[in-house]
Amino acid sequence: GQENATWYRSHFAAVFSEYHLFERLYGLYDMEPERVRELLVTMQISDKTSFEGARFTTLDLSQGQRKRLALLVAILENRPILVLDEWAADQDPSFRRYFYEELLPQLKREGRTVIAVTHDDKYFNVADRVVKMEYGEIVPAAAA
């Protein structure tokens, strides 16, 4: 019931393939502006938008850059489990590599569990565990 919903909301952050961005960081009232600026650099969008007066200066970004900003906000929520639905699909090859080979391992070192839904089989080797689904069903590991 409500207890489970509250638990899930406090433990999961997500960036789905369909998402919405806000200029303000709602619900993140004690956020240090310097931490936001560091993440803008990490996401390689500090030259496109900045964080001033508790808001982003622009959301007028490419689709890939908007997804980076959405991931930045999810990271700031500081929840232990991060669900990313086809997150890398809109990223250029360079940032996609950075995401899988640098950013995901960093999130793991920070103690986060990342569930990355992806078709990027080139990067399956980065995962601790790969779960394959076909037609909405999990395929046994031997068949995957």
Give the positions of each predicted feature.
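Conserved ABC ATPase signature
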Residues: R55-Q65
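A short, proline-enriched helix->beta-strand linker immediately N-terminal to the Walker B motif
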Residues: A74-L82
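Hydrophobic anchor residue at the start of the ABC signature
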Residues: L69-L71
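H-loop (His-switch) and adjacent beta-strand-loop-beta switch element
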Residues: H119, V126-A143
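Catalytic Walker B motif of ABC-type/P-loop ATPase nucleotide-binding domains
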Residues: L82-A89, R96
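Conserved D-loop/post-Walker B switch-helix segment of ABC ATPase nucleotide-binding domains
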Residues: D92-E102
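Conserved "ABC signature" C-loop
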Residues: V15-T57
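Conserved catalytic loops of ABC-family nucleotide-binding domains
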Residues: L104-A116, D120, F124
